[in-house]
């Protein structure tokens, strides 16, 4: 089998020096480099020489596509396999081929395999696609689609790059389908058309919208003003607002179950409940004895009270009644403490207007006023120390003297 020019040159260089065998070049699985060298059968036996650098392609020719680093014109070169075995420029950078990428750097292009670092299977070598450099002001949408044509990429005859014209059209300039007249009409028909409503339905929708806006306005007004300050809607004042009640009585958590009064602490609440007990007991006692309930006292002392205190009329009898009771019990015994049952209507003295000292008597099982007596039969309660002193009978004959002595004492008691 005859060999090509590339292999013959290599064979002549190694003539009479190396015996070529199949195992010397394992990269080739037969074919051009896989035969026994018969022309050098008389060569002396030599040591086994290092395997020669393998060609990138089996045919031994230059790669089909490669770049020339001498200039920066981004021109791809196609090696011709015809008669003269020389490469010609076929595709220029300004041609209208679509690119595989938009990388303007040609140094990153796939380089041929080097000896010792080559492809383990040199028979299958990927062939790169031609590419060119894009202009910066050229958008991708304006580029037409590329229809590949194998006959124009690898011609079997040399063609000059300046006069290169493909046999078949390479590009198909198709307009944007969205700009087509038929497409525009279809899109306009598919758009949402306005709905035509009747007059009655339009009036109903407007009425509903007005009511909704009115409710929204009322809600905003009610939220802006506190509860109870807006009188536009009287029905809202009759509604029990728990939040408002809690805010008013948040600092008074305790409430009386009988009258509804509220208190801040437990001590005040306990005193109030004791008052209810005494009040109920006094009412029962009055009902049992057939007495009329006592009326509330006036703010000021009456004229009869002033005259009674000035003359010392019946007050002497009341005081002497208490004194006689003490004398009957015996002189050796200590005098009994004067006290009267507590009355919620008379908490202060009728003369000095000072509060009475209240305590609970276990003997009488009731709340009592300490050091207090009845001033008159009407039930006026005064302090013992505020009672006027009894006068002798001769003093009653001199009213002027009595007035001069007793009136200042009454005025002094009231001033206290």
From Swiss-Prot:
Which intervals hold the zinc fingers (C2H2-type)?
A: 254-276
Species, as recorded: Arabidopsis thaliana
Q: Which residues form a coiled coil?
A: 199-220
State if NAD is listed as a keyword: no
GO function terms (MF aspect): mRNA binding; RNA polymerase II complex binding; zinc ion binding
Q: Give me the Gene Ontology terms describing cellular component.
A: nucleus
UniProt keyword annotation of Transmembrane helix present: no
Give the quaternary structure. Answer: Forms a complex with cleavage and polyadenylation specificity factor (CPSF) subunits CLPS3, CLPS5, CPSF30, PCFS4, PCFS5, CSTF77 and FIPS3.
Q: Name one GO biological process term.
A: termination of RNA polymerase II transcription
Give the signal peptide, or none: none
Q: Where is the composition biased (Polar residues)?
A: 1-17
Q: Name one Pfam family in it.
A: zf_PCFS4
UniProt-annotated stretches for the region Disordered: 1-80
Q: Where in the cell is it found?
A: Nucleus
Q: List the lineage, top down.
A: Eukaryota, Viridiplantae, Streptophyta, Embryophyta, Tracheophyta
The domain of life for this entry's organism is: Eukaryota
Keywords attached to this entry = Coiled coil, Metal-binding, Nucleus, Zinc, Zinc-finger
Designated name of the protein: Polyadenylation and cleavage factor homolog 1
